[in-house]
Amino acid sequence: MTRNATRILIAPDKFKGSLSAREIAENIAAGLREILPNEKIDIVPMADGGEGTADVICDALEGSWVTCKAHDPLGREIDGRYAYIENKKLAIMEMSEAAGMRRVQPDERNVDLASTFGVGEMLLEAVGHGAHEIIIGLGGSATNDGGFGVGRALGFRFLEGDEELAGAVAELERLTRIELPGDVEALATASAYSKDRRLTQPPLQLDLPRIIAAADVRNPLLGQNGATRVFGPQKGATKDKIDLLERALTKLADVVSKDLGVDYRDEPGAGAAGGLGFGLMSFCGAEIRSGFDVVIEAVDLISKMKDVDFVITGEGSLDRQTLEGKTPAGVARLAHQLGKRVFAVVGRASKDRQVREIFDEVYVTSRLGMSEKESTVRVAELLRERARELAQSL
């Protein structure tokens, strides 16, 4: 009597700066097949709202890519792109496409000048393309403007008395009032950008579709756990600059509450992407959701996991942050709920017991004495090697 083939599901995130989620999954699958050639292996690339989210959902739903003009964090014109699922009228984009760290060189990082204006431009492009729903991943940001730039792109006017603020985050300390775009709740179908970073064409009447902001962190906008104090230093903000930015975003939240009648500063995820979560909720009526939850729905992970025997996940670095909404922890929890064994294949791993105990076993690609450069260059080979070890242990 022949036994049924073991069914294996591989659902990793990307290894940041190295391979995509699909490439990670394919290399793990290749290693497994060397030892287990007759087993059934399913691949479901994953993301958690950070960079790679649009690729994963576009891949799963067989979408296409739309290119558009936008501006980077420092106001330079770029060719951006977002995914579009025609039969669902669904656009999927990442804020990092316009306002990400990858758009600026290390010596250009300036969180006072960096703006999310280009993100607003991309939102308007998707609306003009016919999107009835927009998912936007909040990760990899170079900005800390609380969505100030997005608001300006949509036609909101940020004023000190009768003088319009030009776009630098520090100017928000002088903010006294916010005017709605054009006619009440009108939006621009096409943005215009001048050298002084101001909207130069009046917005036209247009209703926003449903917008879901997919976040991989739950930080509020302000305070010790807020956008500026937690993530500002990673973007080059000094202690003095952090205090200034905190005051600026506090003023923004106060005036939004006064003039728009909403106050999302304490909402989980408001601090994501330099406070863009707050801005999208305030200016677009967006819903903040766990990026992992958004992705598992889009790729239908639960139904794909129900019939497998065990699950493999992974990411570049397994540490305490993994437990805060990252892909491996989400996959592990879902696997446990469904009674599946779950393994992790990762680039690096903390020795923290709380992190490791959610997996049946953790396989690490890097080895003692191996430089980060070597482990990055050899990552495909090392993934296959660890996958062979995993297969032999089954």
For each feature predicted by the language model, list its residue ranges.
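N-terminal loops that bind phosphate or other acidic moieties
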Residues: 2-138, 142-394
